[in-house]
Amino acid sequence: MAEHYFSQNGLTACCTDTTITLFWDKPAAAGAVETYTVLRNDAAVGTTVKTHFTLEHLQPETEYVLFVQWRGGGIGELTVRTTPVKHRLNVTAAPYFAVGDGKTLNTAALQKAMDDCKENECVYFPAGIYMTGALRLHSNMELYLDEGAVLQGTASRFEGTEMECYSSLLNLGTLDHTAGPNCENIILRGKGTIASGGRLLASRIIENERARLKEYLAQNADLVSTCENADTIPGRVRPRLVNMSNCRNIWMQGLTFANGASWNLHMVYSDQIVTDHCTIKSDGVWNGDGWDPDSSTNCTIFACEFCTGDDAVAIKSGKNPEGNIINRPTKHIRVFDCH
C-alpha cells in the first residue's frame, strides 16, 4: 500500500491522492497567537494561526517539498508523495448490492467488500443509511463515506471478543498485550457518519447481562453497593464504536463518529494513530467517551469537535491491577485545536 504517513524534521503529514494534511508542534518560544506560513516547492501557499494546514487540489503520485516557517525561523521541511488514485469498491454495486434504505441489514455484503479490498483500493459508501452488525477490517485498506452516507450499527448486541465485551461496530486488529502490531495502514475518511445503537443498544445489553448475572449480583450485593450505580457490572460488556487493538498507522479524517454504546474511538496497544477534522458525538450515553488511547503510543488528535456523554479524551494505560501487571504505559499523546 502506498505510504500515507510521513514524519521528519518536526513536521508530520497524512496524505491522499489530492490532499496533504500537515501538522507540527507549537514552538517553545511562540506566543499565544502566531502566524505560520506554509510553502510548497519553495512557493508560499497559505498562512495559518493554527499548528496544522491542509493542502488541496494536488496531483496523485507526485512529490511535494513542504516547509513551515514563522517569525522565529523555520519549523521544518518534509517531503511527501501523494498516493495513487484508488479503485473504489462501491458497496451498492455488484457483487455487493448493499442497500442504503435504513432498513436492510447489510452485514454480509459489507463484510465481503471489506474482505475483498486490496492495497490501493477503497470501500466506497455513497449517500444512504447502511444498517450493519459488527465488521472486521484488515491491514492496507480504506473506507470512504461520501456526504450523506451513514454506516449505522443496529441496536442488537454483536458477538463477543476476547476483551470480554461485545464486538464493536468496526473492529481493527486482534488484542494481544504481549505483541506488537498485527493490523496496520488503514484509513477511515470522508464526509459521512459511522454510528451505532447508542443508548438503546447499551440498555439492551445491560438488561441482558443483568438477567444472565442475576445469581452473581444477588450473591455479591455488598460489591454492587460500592459501584457507581446498579448498571456498572452488567454494563461492563458494552461495545465500543470503533476498536483498534494492536494497530499501527491508522488515520481517521473528516467523519462523524456517533453513539457508541460506551466509548467511541478506543485504541489499545496501538501506535501512530491520527484523528483530525472529525466530529465525535455521544450525548446522553453513559461512559460515552470520545477518544481513548489505552496503553498506546504516538496518538494525535486535532481539529475535532466533541459532544460526548462523558470524557472527550481519556488517556488510559490498562484497567485496575491488570494495567500495572501488563505495564504498557501510554506515551506521546498530542491533543490540540479541539473543542
Regions found by a protein language model. Give the residues of each.
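Extracellular/periplasmic carbohydrate-active domains that bind, remodel
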Residues: M1-H339
